[in-house]
Amino acid sequence: QHDVEAAIELLLDAGSLRELASFDLPPRSWLFPLQGVMPWKYLGAGVYFYLDGQDRAIVPTTDNSLLVIQVPEDPAVETFTLVREYDLSRHVKTLPWPKLDSVAWVMPEWPAAGQDVARYWYATIEGLVGVVDARSGDITTWKSGDEIIENSFAVGEEGIFMMTDQALYRLNVDGSDNHNDKIIVDWRQAYDRGPAAKAGHITRGSGTSVTLVGSATDGLVAITDNAAPRIHLELYRRSNGEKVCSVPLFKDNESGTRMAIEDANAK
């Protein structure tokens, strides 16, 4: 049994779903309900984490840290172990009380062949994007005006594909200065965000995460927009952001999505 406000990393038996090990994460703040963010709408607390090639969970937390947690190989004799913690709190904007911003998503930069991940990318619910140097812990951030983020992002060889409530971006890091990385915008494509948030959506904007199709040179980015009366499946070129097609989905005034796009083979 766990408290409803708690945030916990769990290792479960794949067959029985029995809890094998747990790791306590910082709990959700009571301030989020004050700003109208109910628990089912809160996107932080480590929900969007990933496992790396060393079987470590890379977890964003409610107190704006990034945790690297080793998953136990044998939970009968081992437990989760904190390997490293990156403090992101100084790089998350302070908002007027009682509003809070929170790191919600993290993904690795595409690693060079034969090398470990050099940087972690993260994003907050208020639309701040950051890059953490995995070795030094140095942090670089970027924000696009008043745009906010509802969905996870995608990683390609050629950059990071990020979607806000207003536009789709391809972002990169300019590391030409050995002491200061800089986040740059390769391209931006606005989409139809509609007149209001649809049922099941959190914001007025797309409800789907970014999906990459094909290769960096001739592949596509797949999203849905938030157009009224029907949302559209939209495809853009990964290379330059050019829109390739836009197809309306479902019935008038009965469309919306909160899931990533998959093909017939669930890929």
Language model features: what each stretch is:
Residues 1-43, 65-267:
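Extracytoplasmic/lumenal domain signature
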Residues 55-58, 62-68:
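Acidic, Gly/Ser/Thr-rich repeat motifs that build Ca2+-stabilized beta-propeller blades
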Residues 24, 50, 58-60:
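Short, conserved beta-strand segments within well-ordered enzyme catalytic domains
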Residues 46-52:
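N-terminal membrane-targeting/anchoring modules of bacterial envelope and secretion proteins
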